[in-house]
Amino acid sequence: MADSTTAQHVTDEVDVALIGAGIMSATLGAMLRTLEPGWTQVMFERLDAPAQESSSPWNNAGTGHSALCELNYTPEVKGRVQIDKALGVNEKFQISRQFWSYQVNEGVLPSPREWINPVPHVSFGRGEDQVAYLKKRYEALAAHPLFPNMQYTDDRAKFAEMLPLMADGRSEFEKVAISWTDAGTDINYGSQTRQFLKAAEKNGTEIRYGHEVKDIKRDGAKWRVTVKNVHTGDTQVIRANFVFVGAGGMALPLLQKTGIVEIRGWGGFPVSGQWLRCTNPDIIEQHAAKVYGKASIGAPPMSVPHLDTRVIDGEKGLLFGPYAGWTPKFLKKGSYLDLFKSIRPTNLMSYLGVGAQEFGLTKYLITEVMKDQAARMESLREYMPNAKDEDWELVTAGQRVQAIQPVVGPRFSTLAFGTSLINSADGSVAGILGASPGASIAPAAMLELLERCFGQKMVEWGPTIKDMIPSYGIRLATDQKLFNEIWDHTQATLQLDKK
């Protein structure tokens, strides 16, 4: 019996098919448009507008992740703070700043302050152990070129001056400390995505909203992408030279449909998120920082609490969280069958392995799911002692799908925290799995994709890539002069030097 997809008529031939109208597809589309302006691009989005899932501003914390304040990137091992992960994340964020600056100058991202704003990044420690750790972390980072102008204090007066909401009502006997930098950012990835896609359409990219990708199958050296119009039910088949799956949580099921061996064994563990959002403008105005604390012992990195200033559509906001929940859906607007449909004979052991090993995650999720509003407010009061119930509302954030990476027995799998790139051996299809730091390092992830999937083009593309990202191929951690030049340039171009 003939495959029904194969039997269908191909309606379009394109060079690049992008699945999902979020920040990942938008970033790759912009890169390829710069490198190969003659290539045809088409983008498919199941919903009727871009950036409605994880890229939407209230579906994420909007932190420009560069390890300035996030303590999970600097673990303490045998009494020493390890900064390797922090350096790696920071280097990748510098790539983002350079790429965004290039796109600003090219008119692709014409209004940077609509999506990026300067907000201090602060690390918070309470109690003897956390304060001692925070000082060691500060000393390790402050001496490094990638972390200029880091500051630290355990002085209560300075703490109260910087973070009045966190100081007000706090016991004078509790030991606290903070380290901070004014180099932090708050980013509205929804607004950034919309600017990217407005330019993409102007430059010839066709974006089909309300179109859901149902299948992806090999067709010789190309791919047949079956797409359904969610409003009319009509089905089309597009043949593409290259397919990118930037569909957030649905990247796993779509990559499974390709049949590539590289996706075998991978799974996804969905975690829903919630925030407490402040509704009192007077309270919101008293806080101007993104403050990250330390996760509880044994808790996963996703549990790190933070009290965040947001700047969305020109208005300040304030949120606290995240609080986790559990649902089998892979997208906020997904299906309750998503998780179960993703389980295959090739990844069953991966799911079982995670279930047997991740006791910390299991305990954390059970604790979070059992929390009522009173318990959530108690967690907030560890940061903001005088928080009042009537000033905060519970909102649902985006859906995260933690990637489950296959490993050899006896463990069979491990949770891959971060962002994982999966691509076929011939480089004709690729996709992104995982969550944070996600959007913050999208340009670095797409550079890695170009190297893996278009290796034969990299020599030709090299000069243009260097125009977009002057530090390409250079570790800024070892080149203070170049870092300073790039920092000053991107600060000015992104208008981060203006209050």
Swiss-Prot record:
Pathway: Carbohydrate metabolism; tricarboxylic acid cycle; oxaloacetate from (S)-malate (quinone route): step 1/1. One of its GO terms (biological process) is tricarboxylic acid cycle. Its EC number is 1.1.5.4. It catalyses: (S)-malate + a quinone = a quinol + oxaloacetate. Its cofactor is FAD. The keyword Transmembrane helix does not apply. Transmembrane segments: none annotated. GO terms for molecular function: 2-hydroxyglutarate dehydrogenase activity; L-malate dehydrogenase (quinone) activity. Belongs to the MQO family. This is Probable malate:quinone oxidoreductase. It comes from Corynebacterium diphtheriae (strain ATCC 700971 / NCTC 13129 / Biotype gravis). The lineage of its organism: Bacteria, Bacillati, Actinomycetota, Actinomycetes, Mycobacteriales.
